[in-house]
Amino acid sequence: MTEKKEQDMLRKSLLVLLMCLISAYAFAAKDKNEIQVKGSDTMVNLGQGWAEKYMEKNPNAFIAVTGGGSGTGLSSLISGTCDIAMSSRNIKEKEIALANKKGINPNEIKAGLDGLAVVVSPANPVSKLTVSQLGLIFSGKILNWKEVGGKDEKIVLLSREVNSGTHVYFKEHVLRKNDPNGKEEFAPGALLLSSSQAIADEVAGNSAAIGYYGMGYVSSKQKPLAIAKDEKSEYIEPTIDNVLNGKYPISRPLFLYTNGLPQGLVKKFVDFVLSKEGQDIVLATDFVPINR
């Protein structure tokens, strides 16, 4: 046998051995008492709160929670790299079709409710806007704060990135006013930021900025605006009670997605999320529990 053939056989043997080791590792990892939860940046603090409490009660379990956006979480579920996707929007038809092609059956679980707060700096005199005014501002048709009762100052638009469920929801429900044929887009000059916290930090330091995110991120460094459906409607502040009673016009459900009906540790974790203890964590993180 030539030296070249011996080297080829050695390479093939090593390749087979490597594949066996990878398969064995994957099988062993699957049997571990751990799950990966990924997705909505709005929900990441909530998800970590659930995970920490669950692991405190179940020391042998490991729940890893990361953000990245609703689209990122759903893509990970579809590709099989996470067990639970967190999403602040419904899964899209094209995502379901792609999942089905890959043998994934997305199962939707409503885990809480959220109000989208529209925030400005506390130094900004504007305290209320209509949904229509918001649409005009974020699409770039209203450019100066003086047009809505504020200072003579150019508006600085802050938005989440396009893979964010918060971005998608705001565009569909505020810019396009729930019109399935709507074509309105965010103004080209809008700054697309990677997280809700990034928007919160920017608003806190910029008196001309306006942004939006889940109301759980609001602090004393930002001022949430009261929002009205139209000029004839009451202006409503983004509070838990106003989301729960349906008065606040920019509210939405928060979802978990699993591959088929939850099983094993995934089911135990989801059951915990939906329990009174899990829903108390929803309330403690300034979201609205589904069973309140």
Residues covered by each model-derived region:
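Extended rod-forming repeat segments used as scaffolds/tethers
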Residues: 18-19, 48
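Transmembrane alpha-helix boundary/anchor motif
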Residues: 14-15, 21, 277
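Hydrophobic h-region of N-terminal signal peptides that target proteins for export
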Residues: 19-27
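Positively charged n-region of N-terminal signal peptides that target proteins for export
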Residues: 2-13
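Exported/periplasmic ABC-transporter solute-binding proteins
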Residues: 27-292
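Alpha-helical transmembrane segments of integral membrane proteins
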Residues: 11, 15, 155-156
